[in-house]
């Protein structure tokens, strides 16, 4: 379906079947789906009433939103990564939905589209704020996540997997902790100020420093052991992250 979809079920007291899995939505959930994204699923029970907003990309094609809507990462989140709202947040979100509904049912004039798009942007910006709160308030989950990511990358970087499959990808890392890549990156950004790709690079550089400092491997050999196809790519990343070339780092360490 070639629409952006924003759906909120404030009174949902059931479970959502997505693929082969069931997810608990007892708190209600605000869900975002990008155009042509597969979102097939079914509610097994509970109150299904709520709000659904479908927005065709052409509706805001001539507005700044067309360029920066991709910056709202939650349009790429999975069904089990919905935004769960507090009572105050529910009031805010429902007020915006109701305002949009009222505007759509009013007489169209020269300002209708401007007003609707401003409200859509308001909805998206509030959702950004509330997702940030969700990341922060679920600290126990966040701590476990960071520990698990550390374990996954340490195991990967110390195994032959690195030689055979190359540098770990964000997709691989996300699959190991059962998150979508976008949700993982946004959560990491809120916790440590880095997205998932930057986090992987940080761990690669730490491993590279270890090899440069404790072995006699050449820079090319270090690069290949870390999964780089081309030593130049490794040297470029190392210089970007440390302001030193691999050889300069080795000399300074010695």
Give the label of every model feature segment.
Residues 1-78, 109:
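N-terminal regulatory/effector-sensing and dimerization cores
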Residues 28, 172-179, 184, 188, ...:
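Append "Primarily bacterial transcriptional regulators
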Residues 74-122, 126-127:
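Amphipathic alpha-helical segments enriched in hydrophobic/aromatic residues interleaved with Lys/Arg
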Residues 117, 139-177, 198-217:
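A short, Lys/Arg-enriched amphipathic alpha-helix from helix-turn-helix/homeodomain DNA-binding modules
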Residues 129-140:
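C-terminal regulatory or interaction extensions
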Residues 190-229, 251-254:
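Terminal helix-turn-helix DNA-binding modules in bacterial transcription factors
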Residues 235-254:
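…primarily DNA-binding HTH/wHTH and HhH modules…
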């Amino acid at each position: 379906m070639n629409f952006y979809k924003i759906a909120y079920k404030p009174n949902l007291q059931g479970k959502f079947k997505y693929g082969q899995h069931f997810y608990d939505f007892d708190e209600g959930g605000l869900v975002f789906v990008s155009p042509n994204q597969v979102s097939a699923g079914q509610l097994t029970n509970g109150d299904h009433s709520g709000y659904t907003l479908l927005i065709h990309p052409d509706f805001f094609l001539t507005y700044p939103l067309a360029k920066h809507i991709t910056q709202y990462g939650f349009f790429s989140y999975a069904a089990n990564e919905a935004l769960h709202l507090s009572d105050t947040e529910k009031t805010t979100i429902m007020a915006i939905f109701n305002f949009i509904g009222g505007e759509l049912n009013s007489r169209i004039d020269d300002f209708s589209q401007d007003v609707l798009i401003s409200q859509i942007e308001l909805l998206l910006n509030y959702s950004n704020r509330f997702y940030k709160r969700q990341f922060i308030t679920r600290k126990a989950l966040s701590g476990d996540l960071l520990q698990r990511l550390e374990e996954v990358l340490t195991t990967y970087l110390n195994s032959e997997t690195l030689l055979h499959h190359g540098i770990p990808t964000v997709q691989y890392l996300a699959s190991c902790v059962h998150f979508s890549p976008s949700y993982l990156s946004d959560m990491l950004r809120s916790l440590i100020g880095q997205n998932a790709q930057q986090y992987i690079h940080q761990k690669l550089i730490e491993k590279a420093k270890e090899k440069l400092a404790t072995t006699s491997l050449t820079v090319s050999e270090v690069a290949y052991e870390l999964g780089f196809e081309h030593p130049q790519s490794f040297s470029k990343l190392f210089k970007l992250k440390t302001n030193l070339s691999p050889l300069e780092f080795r000399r300074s360490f010695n």
